[in-house]
C-alpha cells in the first residue's frame, strides 16, 4: 500500500514539474498584463503544490487519513450535488463562487498553512479569528488569501 502511494506521489511530482516549467517559459514571453497576472498566480499556487507533494513524499505519507494530507487545503468535486467541497482538517464547506478579481496570490508558507488551519477551525466552531502580530507581517493578506481560496468575501 505504501509503495503505491509513494509511486503515485512521485509520478504526480514529475508531471507537476513539467507543467510548472512550461508555465515559467510562458511567463517569460510577451503577455498582456492580465494574462501575466493570471499565470504568475498559477505559478505561485503550483509551486506550493510542488512543495506539498515533496513534503508528502519525504514524510512517507501512508494515505488520505494522514495528518500531512488532511492539513492541506483541498478541493473535491461532489458528483451528486454538483458542488465543489473544500476541506482542511475537520473543516468542510462548499465553494462559494465569490469572484474576488484577477489578483495576485500570497506565497504560502508553513506559517500560512497553520493560520489557514486555525481560521477554518474557528469557522467550523462558528467562531471568528483575529490573527495577531507585528505590523507588516501579512495578517490581513493571509486572511484575504484564505477568502480567495474558498471564494468567500472576507
Residue map of PLM features:
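Extended, charged/polar low-complexity intrinsically disordered regions
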Residues: 1, 9-110, 114
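Walker A/P-loop
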Residues: 121-154
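Helical mechanochemical/support elements of P-loop NTPase systems and associated helical scaffolds
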Residues: 111, 115, 139-142
Amino acid at each position: 500500500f505504501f509503495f503505491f502511494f509513494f509511486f503515485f506521489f512521485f509520478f504526480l511530482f514529475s508531471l507537476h514539474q513539467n507543467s510548472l516549467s512550461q508555465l515559467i517559459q510562458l511567463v517569460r514571453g510577451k503577455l498582456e498584463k492580465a494574462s501575466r497576472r493570471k499565470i504568475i498566480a498559477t505559478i505561485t499556487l503550483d509551486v506550493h503544490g510542488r512543495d506539498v507533494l515533496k513534503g508528502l513524499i519525504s514524510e512517507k505519507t501512508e494515505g488520505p487519513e494522514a495528518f500531512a494530507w488532511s492539513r492541506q487545503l483541498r478541493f473535491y468535486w461532489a458528483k451528486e450535488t454538483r458542488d465543489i467541497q473544500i476541506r482542511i482538517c475537520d473543516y468542510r464547506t462548499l465553494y462559494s463562487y465569490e469572484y474576488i478579481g484577477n489578483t495576485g496570490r500570497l506565497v504560502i508558507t508553513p506559517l500560512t498553512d497553520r493560520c489557514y488551519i486555525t481560521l477554518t477551525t474557528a469557522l467550523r466552531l462558528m467562531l471568528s479569528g483575529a490573527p495577531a502580530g507585528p505590523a507588516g507581517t501579512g495578517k490581513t493578506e493571509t486572511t484575504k488569501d484564505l477568502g480567495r481560496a474558498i471564494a468567500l468575501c472576507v
